[in-house]
C-alpha cells in the first residue's frame, strides 16, 4: 500500500471509497432494498446497543484478527482494515441521519459514561504495556520484531487490549459528536472561521514541527521547553500560513479552504451551509 506520510488519509479515503463503491451504489439506487435495511438495522437494536456496542465490537474483532502480526504504521498495518470499517460506519450514520441524530441527542449520558470507563481502561492498558514491554496498543506482538516476547498470536491481555483500544477510540468519537451536537450546532462566525483552517493546519503542521525540532534539538533545549515553545510556534506558523493561503482562490482550492458567504449571500440555502460548518 502506498504511504503518503502524514497525508496518508488521502490515499486511504480513495481506497475505501473504491472498495465500498458497490455498497454506495446499491444503497443510493435501492434505498428500500435488503442492504439499505441491513445498514439501517444498526439503529433498530434495542437500547441503542447497535452504535453503543455492536459497532465497537466489530472494530475490536478487526484488531483481534490483524493486530498480533501487524504493527502500527500511521493508517496502515492493522489500522487499515480498522479505518475501513470506521469509514463504513460513518457512511451508515450519514445515510440514516435522522436515526443518527436521534441517537446522538438521546444517548449523551451513556456515551459520556462509556467514554470515562473506556479512558480508565485505556490508561490501565497503557500502564501494563509500559511494565511488560508488550506493545498492547501498538500491535505486532506476534510478529518478527517481537519474537523475544514468545507470543504466538494472543494472550488474555492482548485480547483485552484489542477491545479496550477499539472501545476507547470509538467512544471518544461518539463523545465529541454528542457534545458537539449540543454545544456547537448553531450559527457561529468563529466556528465557520475555524472550520476553514482544518485542512491547511493539518497539511502544513508537519514540516513546521520538523523545522522547530531541528532547531531546538540542535540548541540542546529540554523536552518540556521544546513541547511548550514548539507548540506555540507551530500554532502561530500554521495560523499565518492559513491566513496567507485563504486570500486567493487558487490556494483556497489547493488547501480545501471553503469561503464563508457574505451577508448578501446568506440565502436560506447558505444559512444551512453555514450551520453545517
Where are these regions (language model features)?
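Alpha-helical transmembrane segments and their immediate juxtamembrane cytosolic regions
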Residues: 1-277
